[in-house]
Every structure is written in C-alpha cells, then in structure tokens.
UniProtKB/Swiss-Prot annotation:
Recorded name of the encoding gene: lgalsl
Domain of life according to the entry: Eukaryota
UniProt keyword terms in alphabetical order: Lectin
Function in brief: Does not bind lactose, and may not bind carbohydrates.
SMART domains reported in the protein's UniProt record: Gal-bind_lectin (SM00908), GLECT (SM00276)
Name of the protein in question: Galectin-related protein
InterPro entries: ConA-like_dom_sf (IPR013320), Galectin-like (IPR044156), Galectin_CRD (IPR001079)
Domain Galectin positions: 36-160
GO molecular function: carbohydrate binding
The organism's taxonomic lineage, starting at the top: Eukaryota, Metazoa, Chordata, Craniata, Vertebrata
Amino acid sequence: MAELSAVRQELRSRNLSSSFGELQSPQRDEQKLAVPFCGGIRGGLRPGKKITIMGVVSADPDSFDISLTCGCADVALDMCVRFEEREILRNACVSDQWGDEERSIPYFPFIAEQPFRVEIHCEHPRFLVLVDGHQLFDFYHRVMPLNAIDTIQISGSLTITKLN
C-alpha cells in the first residue's frame, strides 16, 4: 500500500488529471492513458454505473493497481494485482485508516503480454468486478456517499488501451 501512496503523491505533484470519456483523437488517447493514470469520474459513482478498463499486461509484470478514490482522500476500492503471488488484494481506506484486506479469488485471470478487460460495476451494496466477462469478486462499499467516488488511478505493469 506504500507504493500506491507514493504514486498518488507523484500524480498530485505533477498535477496529472483528466476526465475519461472525453478523448477525441488517437494522439490524445495515448497521452491521456499513459501509466500512471489519474482521471476524473464525471458525476462520481452511483448504482448502475460501470467502469471498463481494457489493457495489456507488461512482458515481465510485477504488479498493477486500480483504485477508485474520493479525490486524493478516501480510497473506495484499491485493487492490487500481484503476479508472483498470483493474488488480487482489495481494500479501502477511510479517514486515513485501511480496513481489512480481502484476498480470496476463484482464479487468477491475468497473463503476461495478454490483453484483458476489467469491468467494475457499481451496485447498491457493492462493487461487482468482472475480468474478461467472468465474475472475479465482490467488494462491499466502505465509502459513502457513492457520488463522492470521483477519481480513478491506475499504475504498474500494464498498458491501458481503452477506458470508459
């Protein structure tokens, strides 16, 4: 989790931000989807809203993180994919306090140099996360209100090809 904090600090210091969904040209796409990425979620989250991240895992991956945050404050969902351990850690940070980490997954879906599609569905009680169309895990909301969750941050051993 310390690595994620360092990435967040770097993003803030470089003043990186964008609002995905407004990309217009391939050249702008590449610039806006560079990793580490920090983008706004217009209107915040609400039940029924879905975030889709398409990308390719790096050739020699270590880990990557996808985080949904309330600006630079609370972390509603931190999803840390670790390749050596073949695990996906999930957690939330509310008022600078990390909660209990969740690890259980039915399978590890990510493969070096292979494309993937992650869908994060915001439902009333939880986030439902699918990878390549298959349900991977649920993560029950620890941050409220949902519309305060207005930022997505992505970092690590991946290339982002599409985000909406």
